[in-house]
Curated annotation (Swiss-Prot):
NCBIfam families attached to this UniProt entry: glgA, PRK00654.2-2
Protein name: Glycogen synthase
Catalysed reaction equations from the record: [(1->4)-alpha-D-glucosyl](n) + ADP-alpha-D-glucose = [(1->4)-alpha-D-glucosyl](n+1) + ADP + H(+)
Enzyme class per UniProt: transferase
Entry keywords, A to Z: Glycogen biosynthesis, Glycosyltransferase, Transferase
Any Gene Ontology biological process: glycogen biosynthetic process
Cellular component per GO, a single term: cytosol
CDD domains associated with the record: GT5_Glycogen_synthase_DULL1-like (cd03791)
Function as written in the Swiss-Prot or TrEMBL entry: Synthesizes alpha-1,4-glucan chains using ADP-glucose.
Binding-site list for ADP-alpha-D-glucose: K20
MF term (GO), any: alpha-1,4-glucan glucosyltransferase (ADP-glucose donor) activity
Similarity annotation: Belongs to the glycosyltransferase 1 family. Bacterial/plant glycogen synthase subfamily.
EC number: 2.4.1.21
Organism per entry: Aeromonas salmonicida (strain A449)
Amino acid sequence: MAINPLKILFVASEVEGLVKTGGLADVARALPLYLAQKGHDVRIILPFYKTIKRRDEARLIASRWLPTHPGLPDIGYRIYQMELEGVCVYLLDCPQYFDRPQLYAENNQAYGDNGERFAFFSAAALHACEQLDFAPEIVHCNDWHTGLLPLLLKTRHAHNPFFQHTRSVISIHNAAFQGVFGREQFWAMPEIADYEQRISYDYGHVNLLKCGVLYADKINAVSPNYASELLTHLGAHGMANIFQQRAADLRGILNGCDYKDWDPAFDDFLPATYDVDNLAGKRVCKQTLQQEAGLPVTDLPIYGMVCRLTEQKGVHLLLPVLDKFLHHKVQVVIVGSGDPSLAAQLQATAQRYPDKLAFLNTYDDRLAHLVEAGADFFLMPSLFEPCGLNQMYSLAYGTLPLVRAVGGLKDTVVDWDAEPEHATGFCFNDPTANILLDAMRRSLLYYLQDPERFAQVQRNAMNTRFNWPDSVTQYEQMYQDALARQ
């Protein structure tokens, strides 16, 4: 059912193509683009960081002062405008907050004023709408960085005719990061004092994600299974009671995959392309991966992994059993950076097995694409994974994902044994090293003993699609439900 075009303000702390640290940026680029293709007037707004790409394309359109509190100084900022694939992007420039080397942290140390920085961003995003005469029907917030916007719409702007028809939604990309800050950072926000009891994390601290969840008109998690997990104490990172309060307004919408960037038939990063009907190029990619990783060029199965080196990604589950697994006739290629301790352990293991394990303590797009194309299996033993994108890429590239059945991984990967006709990979449940090892050995056994079945599962994987237009239809319904709230 077609719906009338809406005015949508998409508020995010990062957008792929301009600035990115994680999966939020991918969604913040793709979702507005596909909404715009459906005829909606979508405008993205984000901070004008020092690290923004294509800065020279941004043009100054306004200079304004954000009112704060009687007796306290207003905050000056400038509004820049550019386009990203035809979608209007506003960049809020305030050097005291955003003229820094990184987005959120330096040397693994978060900026001490992140609460103040993103409180300003939230307030300025709404202020900028008025200055630009853009009255959105939907303000789409994302994660803790924008958690104050729903509260501001219901307090500061509750009787503002400009926002009379505006409703807010918030997408939860990762509830582990909640934006908890001392209340002194919100000196420009009198609303915080009035509502502190509801949105406080502990005495004297404000939880911005909690704020967004409590005051948004509708809430979505980035996969159906993750939405269910947020209602449990095990999956909600201390916020289960808050999500339970809003359960009627919470839904799960699976992220789409942007196949124009992730299609092995048209991937400029690859030494050879391929598709489901002709996998010759995949064999070339495998040989190139082995060469670039410094491994012998053989027919051994390759297990790939591309991730941030964090506990969330399950690296600590893999490390205790990596030695045992490398005693089999396999190769493993791990690409990623992050926790120095995890990196050191991986490096030490690679030195013990130079012909079997390659650890590349880095990240770049070309290498990520090569691992997806050249590996036979892709490891994602995550402790939690709200949606996950790499498993979608792996499926498209005929690289069978081996995942822990959590969050979006459970929604997107069909286990070899659980549903033989529709299998696309391998799943395991318990977050223990030995259970992971069992799953890896199971995948290896099937690879060696049943190549015909492996080829069929590979075809199933490559024919699986998670298209953004399907997700957009669900977002449109959520927007309509939000607008129906009184």
